[in-house]
């Protein structure tokens, strides 16, 4: 993280002294994103839920990281669920792209890894979608809440999981535990 901050300061100095007047907008957007990420990653690390762990495969690339969530209550207790988070160049005007890497039986997470969480949507009917005022902390806390208070059986992405819960809660719990045993340890 400190390496990236130093690199940004160096690049800013080079740009100020030697960049011609029509500088590349994409490079400027990346720079804005990276500046935001330096601040947001520090805030995230200071306010990370106890059930979450963030890792950066490349500490110089804050735009790509992994999140591990180990719920401490509910159906998913005992599991460790991995998510990949990619922050696009147009951040914070668009939300990060998130995928669940762990196979899971969950009404709001498809077995293919897609996630139904309103704050990850660019546009949402209920007004709770992405806004430039949201941060990585909101994303991580939202993902963490999918295992507790945001677990939503009424508006599912995985309809089979939601219907399974409606039909037989105990069998649903057993299937969740089978998935944890087989994929989430």
Swiss-Prot record:
Protein's pathway: Protein modification; protein neddylation
Entry EC number(s): 2.3.2.34
Keywords: ATP-binding, Nucleotide-binding, Transferase, Ubl conjugation pathway
GO terms assigned for molecular function: ATP binding; NEDD8 conjugating enzyme activity; NEDD8 ligase activity; NEDD8 transferase activity
Catalyzed chemical reaction(s): [E1 NEDD8-activating enzyme]-S-[NEDD8 protein]-yl-L-cysteine + [E2 NEDD8-conjugating enzyme]-L-cysteine = [E1 NEDD8-activating enzyme]-L-cysteine + [E2 NEDD8-conjugating enzyme]-S-[NEDD8-protein]-yl-L-cysteine
Catalytic center residues: 116 (glycyl thioester intermediate)
A GO CC annotation given for this chain: nucleus
EC class name: transferase
Gene Ontology BP annotations: protein neddylation
Domain UBC core: 32-185
Annotated region described as Interaction with uba3, given as residue ranges: 1-29
Family indicated by similarity: Belongs to the ubiquitin-conjugating enzyme family. UBE2F subfamily.
Function: Accepts the ubiquitin-like protein NEDD8 from the UBA3-NAE1 E1 complex and catalyzes its covalent attachment to other proteins. Together with the E3 ubiquitin ligase rnf7/rbx2, specifically neddylates cullin-5 (cul5). Does not neddylate cul1, cul2, cul3, cul4a or cul4b.
Name of the protein in its database record: NEDD8-conjugating enzyme UBE2F
